[in-house]
């Protein structure tokens, strides 16, 4: 290069520009690999007490659920799901209700 400004004639490319895979030379450390692995959700035991949808008998239900799971189940029970006791189930099965 002669002078204060470079000209196209002064620039010499030694290597051709080629596309490369940006992930080709990367290695993940063990810490990063562990962080990438999804953590198993934490399940908490719950005792649910609800009345039968047929005869108003008290029912107890024991479940293991995540925080999101128990809230979704609660919303279902409050809105559009009714649990029934074994006696009411038989009545429904036999066409009595």
Curated annotation (Swiss-Prot):
Q: Does the keyword Lipid metabolism apply?
A: no
GO terms for MF:
DNA binding; DNA-binding transcription factor activity; protein domain specific binding; zinc ion binding
Q: Where in the cell is it found?
A: Host cytoplasm; Host nucleus
Locus of motif LXCXE motif: 22-26
Subunit-level organization:
Homodimer. Homooligomer. Interacts with host RB1; this interaction induces dissociation of RB1-E2F1 complex thereby disrupting RB1 activity. Interacts with host EP300; this interaction represses EP300 transcriptional activity. Interacts with protein E2; this interaction inhibits E7 oncogenic activity. Interacts with host TMEM173/STING; this interaction impairs the ability of TMEM173/STING to sense cytosolic DNA and promote the production of type I interferon (IFN-alpha and IFN-beta).
Keywords assigned: Activator, DNA-binding, Early protein, G1/S host cell cycle checkpoint dysregulation by virus, Host cytoplasm, Host nucleus, Host-virus interaction, Inhibition of host innate immune response by virus, Inhibition of host interferon signaling pathway by virus, Interferon antiviral system evasion, Metal-binding, Modulation of host cell cycle by virus, Oncogene, Transcription, Transcription regulation, Viral immunoevasion, Zinc, Zinc-finger
Record motif Nuclear export signal, residues: 70-78
Question: What does the sequence similarity comment in the record state about its family?
Answer: Belongs to the papillomaviridae E7 protein family.
What's the protein called, per UniProt? Protein E7
What does the function comment of this entry state? Answer: Plays a role in viral genome replication by driving entry of quiescent cells into the cell cycle. Stimulation of progression from G1 to S phase allows the virus to efficiently use the cellular DNA replicating machinery to achieve viral genome replication. E7 protein has both transforming and trans-activating activities. Induces the disassembly of the E2F1 transcription factor from RB1, with subsequent transcriptional activation of E2F1-regulated S-phase genes. Interferes with host histone deacetylation mediated by HDAC1 and HDAC2, leading to transcription activation.
Annotated segments matching region E7 terminal domain: 1-40
HAMAP family per the record?
PPV_E7 (MF_04004)
Quote the cellular component terms of the Gene Ontology held in the record. host cell cytoplasm; host cell nucleus
């Amino acid at each position: 290069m002669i002078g204060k400004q470079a000209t196209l004639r002064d620039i010499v490319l030694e290597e051709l520009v080629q596309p490369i895979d940006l992930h080709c030379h990367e290695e993940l450390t063990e810490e990063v690999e562990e962080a990438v692995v999804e953590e198993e959700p934490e399940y908490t035991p719950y005792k649910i007490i609800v009345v039968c949808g047929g005869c108003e008998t008290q029912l107890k239900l024991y479940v293991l659920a995540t925080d999101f799971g128990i809230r979704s189940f609660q919303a279902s029970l409050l809105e559009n799901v009714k649990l029934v006791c074994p006696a009411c189930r038989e009545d429904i099965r036999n066409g009595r209700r």
